[in-house]
């Protein structure tokens, strides 16, 4: 445990001392804000659900975010009850105080990281089967999730292991969510076998 804490403290202070710049802070704050509570991913999911071809993918993202809420917000956070770095180190000057969450909220795991990687992995897997030529968008989503995770450490809102755990859990949840969405699609299409759909879509052939 001491080794993990030492790693966390060393890395977050390294980022704080070597990567914080005045021009970068508002960018990190904006990225963090638009992904708070899964907002960006919910919007993407709703937009996908408006299209028959990508409706199943949109549902899968909502499933993933549901797991994130149950496992992260309702399960791990209150039970682990890890304090945030800016609470542990109140004398540190954070990049932007207004970008910080409530001091009473817990740090482990990072909800931003968990939700972003769960959604991005779902998008990557879904596009790989629905529209393989667009799988690169899933890769971009995963790369964007790395930036989201970094923004949380940058802003002194999370320790590195908070976001790394969010990454790992998010990838697992993404796999599960897409699997469940496929099962749901198979169940639906088997009930309506008089209509032939393109794989994992509601777009008729």
What is each of the regions a protein language model found here?
Residues 4-7, 20-27, 34-35, 51, ...:
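Structural motif marking the loop-to-transmembrane transition
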Residues 14, 45-49, 149, 153:
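Solvent-exposed, amphipathic alpha-helical segments
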Residues 44-72, 138:
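Interfacial segments of alpha-helical transmembrane regions
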Residues 62-71, 75, 168, 172-176:
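Hydrophobic, lipid-facing residues on alpha-helical transmembrane segments of integral membrane proteins
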Residues 96-205:
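Membrane-embedded catalytic cores of phosphoryl/pyrophosphoryl-handling enzymes
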Residues 18, 22, 50, 54, ...:
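Membrane-interface elements of multi-pass transporters and channels
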Residues 1-40, 73-105, 203-205:
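N-terminal transmembrane-helix/juxtamembrane module of multi-pass inner/ER membrane proteins
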């Amino acid at each position: 445990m001491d080794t993990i804490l030492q790693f966390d403290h060393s890395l977050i202070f390294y980022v704080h001392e070597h990567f914080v710049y005045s021009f970068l802070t508002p960018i990190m704050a904006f990225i963090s804000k638009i992904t708070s509570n899964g907002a960006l991913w919910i919007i993407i999911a709703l937009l996908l659900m408006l299209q028959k071809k990508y409706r199943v993918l949109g549902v899968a993202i909502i499933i993933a975010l549901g797991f994130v809420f149950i496992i992260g917000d309702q399960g791990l956070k209150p039970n682990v009850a890890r304090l945030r770095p800016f609470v542990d180190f109140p004398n540190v000057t954070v990049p932007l105080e207004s970008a910080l969450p409530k001091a009473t909220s817990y740090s482990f795991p990072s909800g931003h990281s968990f939700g972003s990687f769960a959604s991005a992995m779902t998008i990557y897997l879904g596009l790989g089967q629905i529209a393989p030529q667009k799988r690169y968008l899933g890769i971009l989503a995963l790369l964007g999730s790395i930036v989201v995770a970094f923004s949380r450490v940058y802003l002194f809102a999370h320790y590195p292991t908070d976001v790394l755990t969010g990454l790992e859990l998010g990838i697992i949840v993404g796999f599960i969510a897409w699997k469940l969405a496929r099962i749901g699609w198979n169940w639906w299409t088997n009930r309506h076998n008089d209509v032939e759909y393109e794989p994992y879509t509601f777009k008729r052939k």
